[in-house]
Amino acid sequence: MTLQLNGEMLTINDIKTFLNKEDTVEVTQEALERVKKSRQTVEHIIENKETIYGITTGFGLFSDVRIDKDEYNQLQVNLIRSHACGVGKPFSEEVALVMMVLRLNTLLKGHSGTTVALVEQLVYYINNRIVPVIPQQGSLGASGDLAPLSHLALALIGEGNVFFKGEEVDSRYVLNQLNRNPIQLQAKEGLALINGTQAMTAQGVINYIEAEALGYQAEWIAALTHQALNGITDAYNEKVHKARNFQEQIDVAARMLDWLDGSELTTTQGDIRVQDAYTLRCIPQIHGASFQVFNYVKEKLEFEMNAANDNPLIFDEGDETLVISGGNFHGQPIAFALDFLKLGVSELANVSERRLERLVNPQLNNGLPAFLSPQPGLQSGAMIMQYAAASLVSENKTLAHPASVDSIPSSANQEDHVSMGTIASRHGYHIIENARRVLAIETIIALQAVEYKDIDKLSPKTYEKYQELRHIVPSITEDRQFHKDIEAVSQYLQDLAYM
């Protein structure tokens, strides 16, 4: 399939499908016409020797330095080379690929003044999966993600490394193999490639996809735990949740009842106890709040995916054309959103760890063996899995500290406030990985716990999950290296996010 790009209507679901099916991209004719018209403005500026930031001047503190006309193109190449100061491990291939798609989509709005040739080069790289190797660290999140996007731009001009067919290789080598020339950057184009928030937004899109999936997965995992503990279903009654009327809470309660429908292990209030602990009783309230966060983040990401965040921006007003220096590259809206996402995911892990603690604690688990050990004393069972979960949620509490409240001035105080949004995105993904492992641990323990209660009494939907997962992780009949089980179930959960 082909993903049509026009700068206006790209969605997270489009990106998810694009990644899952290895689609190609195609630019609409209408968008190309906007690009051409925008470029005409840049050519007019050059012809008339106007003073416009980043086209005929230097950058940052050097914005008052006028550049000679015969050096306009070299200025753009120098910009890319000097700004490619990223360090550390690279972004995943998926994030870097999404970064290219998002930057292309921004250019198609027709406010950036690039050539059609640059657009075509981006399309070629995306469709042939020539993916720039982009270090994760080094961005302040304003003026956009300068360092990461400079590494992206390097690949387009045949410098730097790329991922290609499963290997990291020199970009010039790949271009030679494909008989493709590197792009020759024209005036304004280097700046148009790197002034934006595509690194934080691309990682943010991946974060959202996997976080939302974790939210849904946490429900059937919690449903297994609920049955192992003979939980009370009255708390999920629709009347309770409509009385508060948060839609996400109502939806989680309905889905929990759906997962539990037909179970012979659940109870009603008064059967065994009058009410459950909060980690069971308040699943709709807790998980629902995380979905509120996810919905907020999705809205902000999709705004930014279709936004013009270059500088300066070109506006064709019919009778006149305006070139305006602004600050749409500032990542604060996305930085806030991605910090918020960290909280929503962290709480899914926090409540999961408390649920799995109830499963292994003989004082709380309604008659199950201590730590679900097949031979208590001789075999430790799930004891240290709870330790691991506790460690992961504690680590998340430090990672959840908001990056967006920090700022360090740069460029001799010309760029005196920055967003740190890319740090928020990176820390957010670490939180998601940790949370996924916590939920994997709850899954393993809940699967074992329901075996003590009789798996034939599970609800039909959770019984299907039980059978599916037993092909991945066997029953605990004796102590073994549980880290392998945790990683296997975690990978299973991650794979589900893209199905």
UniProtKB/Swiss-Prot annotation:
Pathway assignment: Amino-acid degradation; L-histidine degradation into L-glutamate; N-formimidoyl-L-glutamate from L-histidine: step 1/3
Molecular function terms, GO-annotated: histidine ammonia-lyase activity
InterPro entries: Aromatic_Lyase, Fumarase/histidase_N, HutH, L-Aspartase-like, Phe/His_NH3-lyase_AS
Cross-link (5-imidazolinone (Ala-Gly)): A142-G144
Localization terms from the record: Cytoplasm
PANTHER family assigned: HISTIDINE AMMONIA-LYASE
Superkingdom classification of source: Bacteria
2,3-didehydroalanine (Ser) modifications at: S143
One of the protein's GO biological processes: L-histidine catabolic process to glutamate and formate
Catalytic activity, reaction form: L-histidine = trans-urocanate + NH4(+)
Full protein name: Histidine ammonia-lyase
EC nos: 4.3.1.3
Pfam families: Lyase_aromatic
Gene name in the database record: hutH
